[in-house]
Design a protein with these regions (language model features):
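Short Lys/Arg-rich basic patches
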Residues: 1-13
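Short, Lys/Arg-enriched anionic-surface-contact patches
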Residues: 2-4, 52-72
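Short amphipathic alpha-helical segments
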Residues: 11-13, 21, 28-41
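Short alpha-helical "recognition helix" segments of helix-turn-helix
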Residues: 21-24, 91-94
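Short, basic interhelical loop/turn and adjoining N-cap
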Residues: 30-31, 93-105
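Short, solvent-exposed alpha-helical "recognition" segments
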Residues: 42-49, 106-119
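Short Lys/Arg-enriched helix C-cap and helix-to-coil transition segments
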Residues: 49-55, 116-131
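Short, amphipathic alpha-helical "recognition" segments used to contact nucleic acids or chromatin
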Residues: 68-85
Length: 143
């Protein structure tokens, strides 16, 4: 993984906020600075892209539609379809039981962070391929 450029940022924080940050960082097994950076990063992304939230899981945190699927899942579906342009928006919305507006929200987020979403698609595709191969080995072993 490439090193990231960083800068020091000094700020005065409310004591209660820092106490909660300390509790959350201990529970998450990370330091306060990293957790605060994550909160600021995700918070600014949510401000810039209303309707986007972040969820944790076994493969890490990922962007998702509020009340909907992960952005990588939506984009995987949209890119995998035959429709293009506005038809792709409508087809994806119908397939995932979303509104056209929700699909556009995801597409706008993807437009800003394509590498992040494409990496997630690749990671999950590899995981699915590995799971399929494991299942096939199990079936072969069972005769």
């Amino acid at each position: 993984m490439a090193a990231r450029d960083t800068q020091t940022f000094s700020a005065r924080w409310d004591t209660d906020v820092l106490d909660r940050l300390k509790q959350r960082s201990e529970a998450a097994g990370t330091n306060k600075s990293r957790l605060a950076e994550r909160y600021v990063d995700e918070g600014t992304r949510m401000d810039e892209h209303p309707g986007i939230v972040f969820r944790g899981g076994p493969t890490g945190r990922r962007a998702a539609l509020a009340g909907g699927p992960d952005i990588w899942e939506l984009m995987f579906t949209l890119k995998g379809g035959k429709a293009r342009g506005e038809e792709a928006i409508t087809a994806t919305a119908e397939l995932l039981n979303l509104t056209d507006s929700q699909v556009r929200t995801a597409v706008r987020y993807y437009g800003t962070f394509p590498d992040e979403i494409d990496r997630r698609i690749i990671l999950n595709t590899l995981d699915a391929d590995e799971a399929e191969a494991a299942w096939q080995r199990e079936q072969a072993a069972l005769g």
